[in-house]
Amino acid sequence: MTKEDQKRDEIFYNETLAPDDINRLLDAKVFTNFKRIDKKGEHKLDGLNRDEKGIIKDNLIIKGNNLLALASLKKEFAGKVKLIYIDPPYNTGNDGFKYNDSFNHSSWLVFMRNRLEIARQLLSDDGSIYIQLDYNEAHYGKIIMDEVFGRNNFQREIIWKLGGLAGYKSLANNFIRGHETILFYSKTQNFSFNKIYLPYNEAQLKRFSGVDKEGKKYKIITKDKKLYLDNAKGVPISDLWDDIASFQTVVNSQEIMDFDGQKPEKLLLRIIESSSNKGDIVLDYHAGTGTTLAVAHKMGRQYVGIEQMDYIHELPESRLKKVIAGE
């Protein structure tokens, strides 16, 4: 299934609409046809689980237009979501955005901003958002993010190297495109972040060439400072991610589904581990194949996923049933 097969009737609003029209459009809607899924299968929902403060503690998958769904979630989740990850349409001409060419770019910008403004309201004050884009809209995406979240809350531009330069892409008479961009923003400067370290490789381990009287290895940091291998955490991850292969280069993974643009679980694991902790709420309002939700479930996070296309049943829902069953 390609994104071109997934034609969308998206909802936009802009400054030409009267404020009352916008308010009516974004009034909270009633969610219907709820069902509960657990290890025993599907059940009729008899109510949502809540904590002592009345906060919903169930994981939610919502089928519907994500603009309306986001607006409807505000009552329950405003200020409560710790992490948002989205992998929105890249506006390539092959992703369902088949509008009049003269409005294509502006339509994408309006589409993104409408949703980001509501998404920001859902984030907790120590929350973060990651938005994944390619060269088509990454730079315009940053301008929108600067406007919605504030330029001072821009944290990093993460470059994800897709893998080996092979196949039809290598035939271009130009520098070969080999990366996507992930924009990392926080809601405030007081954001939650867990620094991640990678194991040392063989060359890096050789730098611990000193040995003290007790036989412990160390390396010299400064004239007066040593770092012992036993105390070293590893190599802190930078904003260049070249150690996670995309499905453009990995073709035999059991994760792969019939869906263009699917992201590997390792990518979401890194993002979720970096910017959330167990029990925190993770939101993905472009749920797609459900990778974010599957990884969040495995990592003990609460999650909310939104997808309007009918494949929500055959892709994210069926995938999560397997995860819930213990995959």
Name these PLM-found stretches.
Residues H105-W160, E317:
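Conserved Class I SAM-dependent methyltransferase catalytic core
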